[in-house]
Amino acid sequence: MALLTAKTFSLQFNNKRRIKRPYYPRKALLCYQLTPQNGSTPTRGYFKNKKKCHAEIRFINEIKSMGLDETQCYQVTCYLTWSPCPSCVRELVAFIKAHDHLNLRIFASRLYCHWCRRQQEGLRLLCGSQVPVEVMGSREFADCWENFVDHEKPLSFNPSEMLEELDKNSRAIKRRLERIKQSWSVDVLENGLRSLQLGPVSSSLSRSNSR
């Protein structure tokens, strides 16, 4: 399979809040690993966004084209530079619902437009559809580096230091995602209380949802 260059990995999976000059676009990349539960060799690959076709859609089309045995279960792990947009979320949810022999897990280096309500609702939709979404940490960055990057060419940086920095930066992003998930839980509780006609939600509960 084609591998990412070390430079591409270091630039595109960079999870700093702000990047230093020279500025560059942080593009969407999706690395996937499909592992059959019968112990067969995993299948790996990666996709970039193309014009009018996001990496997530290219990934879905690739899995569909494999003609997988629907009597066998598969674990699919995706490492993304950006969390999916709302449109891709809907496609991923529909895909997984139609292929219940696939168990999909998503790990993102960064949260795309996390302050926008539509983006937050997309993340909630994935979690509510039994598609775990988490922020990449030390284990995921190391696995992605090990399995999707070409290590044969000389490096201009220290990989260990890079991975440590990625893990350090990921902590704030993990807290941000956790707040989004918690706000979803509170919204569900509020709706449940209203449907039971138990009156308005207490102000203390509402305050606990402020960010």
UniProtKB/Swiss-Prot annotation:
Cellular compartment(s): Cytoplasm
Paired cysteines (S-S): none
Transmembrane segments: none
Residue sites binding Zn(2+) per the record: H54, C85, C88
A Pfam family matched in the record: APOBEC3
Keywords: Antiviral defense, Cytoplasm, Hydrolase, Immunity, Innate immunity, Metal-binding, Zinc
Active site: E56
GO biological process: cytidine to uridine editing; defense response to virus; DNA cytosine deamination; innate immune response; negative regulation by host of viral genome replication; negative regulation of single stranded viral RNA replication via double stranded DNA intermediate
Catalytic activity: a 2'-deoxycytidine in single-stranded DNA + H2O + H(+) = a 2'-deoxyuridine in single-stranded DNA + NH4(+)
Enzyme Commission numbers on file: 3.5.4.38
Record-level GO cellular component terms: cytoplasm; nucleus; P-body
GO molecular function terms attached to this record: cytidine deaminase activity; RNA binding; zinc ion binding
Gene3D superfamilies, per database record: Cytidine Deaminase, domain 2 (3.40.140.10)
Domain annotation CMP/dCMP-type deaminase: ranges: 4-126
Top-level class of the enzyme under EC nomenclature: hydrolase
CDD domains reported in the protein's UniProt record: cytidine_deaminase
PROSITE patterns recorded: CYT_DCMP_DEAMINASES_1, CYT_DCMP_DEAMINASES_2
Cofactor(s) of this protein: Zn(2+)
Quaternary structure annotation from Swiss-Prot or TrEMBL: Homodimer.
Note: APOBEC3H from old world monkeys has retained its antiviral activity, while it is lost in other primates.
Job of this protein: DNA deaminase (cytidine deaminase) which may act as an inhibitor of retrovirus replication and retrotransposon mobility via deaminase-dependent and -independent mechanisms.
Record-stated family: Belongs to the cytidine and deoxycytidylate deaminase family.
Protein name: DNA dC->dU-editing enzyme APOBEC-3H
